[in-house]
């Protein structure tokens, strides 16, 4: 019988079947650009900028905006934000601009236009008798792009969180160098009338383009990023969490991965570090690949690397970090096992610093210190024949090497120690847990064991 089949009987008849499950039909797509062309979108005919401003502002005051017209205006307004490229700018082999070139957000991408006219003449704006200033254009652009940030705020945020964010954004765009163009609470009212701006591909594309530009080019109106910053590393929560994790525990990526004692990490680590990506390149298209439409399904999201994501946030919970306690558990990625490993790693890296003298009064004191430290190391390495130094190293609990941590987990039967459980309960029980959060998981799973 084939090794991938199972055998059983039905009504005394032998049956052999091959168990198969549904395969994820959506393949992860990496954002590498292979055709050497800038990311592109197609919009309607470019409007008269001043007429478009009046029409869009009128629609905003009435809390009724047409997404196509908004996108057409935002693309046309890019010409107002000219800046100087600080360095040669390339990404995925594409030359974006040379050092010293005058550039606008439109330089970063390819915006194609059709002959389809927008509904500018029908959308009002007759009450504006003068043409807007650049400061007023900048305020409108900033307010429109802020609809993206508001639409990305999770419903799990309680109270008036979103309203407070909207109010602070309005305050930014009514003070210099911007100009007040709307009444208080207009932004939130407009958002409520259409709360799904982040799902509109062209709007997302333009938000990412503006953010990529203002993140690199020093500009008078760089505060526009307040509404677009959420496009940076969008759908990269797995990779972003891993980056924060290694900084937190003061290890390199290579050193940290040596502590990932589970077979399900293998595929995720391979996925996260696919060759050919510009994950470590500043100002790359990679940073905004999701908003620029370069990937339909991110291989760096929390769902794509769920075991890594779960482990990192269980360690964060052990350390009492609010962000980790509030994060959503990936329930399909072995949360119980990840909580065990997270407990051991949390114990190793929580409240244990690595300290050494680095500054001295003079060169002689430095040399004396180095000589004394070298002598200590020689003595520590000397084997007096009475103790197996290898066993002592791994069983004493005084080392945090991957081998030592793994040995301690195995010696405890792959289970958490009572001290781990007490710590988990201590941090999670004092936290107002959100549905499906790590705090809720720890409370439900370990409260009876404390």
Swiss-Prot record:
UniProt KW keywords: Capsid protein, Helical capsid protein, Host cytoplasm, Phosphoprotein, Ribonucleoprotein, RNA-binding, Superantigen, Viral nucleoprotein, Virion
Additional record remark: Displays a superantigen activity in human and mouse, activating mostly V-beta-8 subtypes of T-cell receptor.
Primary site of residence: virion
Subunit structure comment from the entry: Homomultimerizes to form the nucleocapsid. Binds to viral genomic RNA. In nucleocapsid, binds protein P and thereby positions the polymerase on the template. Protein P acts as a chaperone on free protein N to prevent it from aggregation before encapsidating genomic RNA.
Protein name per the record: Nucleoprotein
Sequence similarity: Belongs to the lyssavirus nucleocapsid protein family.
Gene: N
UniProt modification remark: Phosphorylated by host CK2. Unphosphorylated protein N seems to have a better affinity for leader viral promoter encapsidation. Phosphorylation of protein N in ribonucleocapsid may stabilize the interaction with protein P, thereby playing an important role in viral transcription/replication.
Superkingdom per UniProt: Viruses
UniProt GO molecular function: RNA binding
Species whose genome carries this gene: Australian bat lyssavirus (isolate Bat/AUS/1996) (ABLV)
Gene3D superfamilies linked: Nucleoprotein, Rhabdovirus nucleocapsid protein like domain
């Amino acid at each position: 019988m084939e090794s991938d089949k199972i055998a059983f009987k039905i009504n005394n008849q032998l049956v052999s079947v091959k168990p198969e499950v549904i395969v994820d039909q959506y393949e992860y797509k990496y954002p590498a650009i292979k055709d050497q062309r800038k990311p592109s979108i197609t919009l309607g005919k470019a409007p008269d900028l001043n007429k478009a401003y009046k029409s869009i502002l009128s629609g905003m005051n009435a809390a009724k905006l047409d997404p196509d017209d908004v996108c057409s205006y935002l693309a046309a307004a890019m010409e107002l934000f000219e800046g100087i490229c600080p360095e040669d700018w390339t990404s995925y082999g594409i030359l974006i601009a040379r050092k010293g070139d005058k550039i606008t957000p439109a330089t970063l991408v390819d915006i194609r236009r059709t002959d389809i006219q927008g509904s500018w003449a029908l959308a009002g704006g007759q009450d504006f008798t003068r043409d807007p200033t650049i400061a007023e254009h900048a305020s409108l652009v900033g307010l429109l792009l802020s609809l993206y940030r508001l639409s990305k705020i999770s419903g799990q945020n309680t109270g008036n969180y979103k309203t407070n964010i909207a109010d602070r954004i309005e305050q930014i765009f009514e003070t210099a160098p911007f100009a007040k163009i709307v009444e208080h609470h207009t932004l939130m009212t407009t958002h409520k009338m259409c709360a799904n701006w982040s799902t509109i591909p062209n709007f997302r594309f333009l938000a990412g383009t503006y953010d990529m530009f203002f993140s690199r080019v020093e500009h008078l109106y760089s505060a526009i990023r307040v509404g677009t910053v959420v496009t940076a590393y969008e759908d990269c929560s797995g990779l972003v969490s891993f980056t924060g994790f290694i900084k937190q525990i003061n290890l390199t990526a290579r050193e940290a991965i040596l502590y990932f004692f589970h077979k399900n990490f293998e595929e995720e680590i391979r996925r996260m570090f696919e060759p050919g990506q510009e994950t470590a390149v500043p100002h790359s298209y990679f940073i905004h690949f999701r908003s620029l439409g370069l990937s339909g399904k991110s291989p760096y999201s929390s769902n794509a690397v769920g075991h890594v994501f779960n482990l990192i946030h269980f360690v964060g919970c052990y350390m009492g970090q609010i962000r980790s306690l509030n994060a959503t558990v990936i329930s399909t990625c072995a949360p119980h096992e990840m909580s065990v490993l997270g407990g051991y790693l949390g114990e190793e890296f929580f409240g244990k610093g690595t300290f050494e003298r680095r500054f001295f009064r003079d060169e002689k004191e430095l040399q004396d210190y180095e000589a004394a430290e070298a002598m200590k190391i020689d003595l520590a390495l000397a084997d007096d024949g009475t103790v197996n130094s290898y066993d002592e190293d791994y069983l004493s609990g005084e080392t945090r090497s991957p081998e030592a941590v793994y040995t301690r987990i195995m010696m405890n039967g792959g289970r958490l120690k009572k001290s781990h459980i007490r710590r988990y309960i201590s941090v999670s029980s004092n936290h107002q847990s959100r549905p499906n959060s790590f705090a809720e998981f720890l409370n439900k799973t370990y409260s009876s064991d404390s």
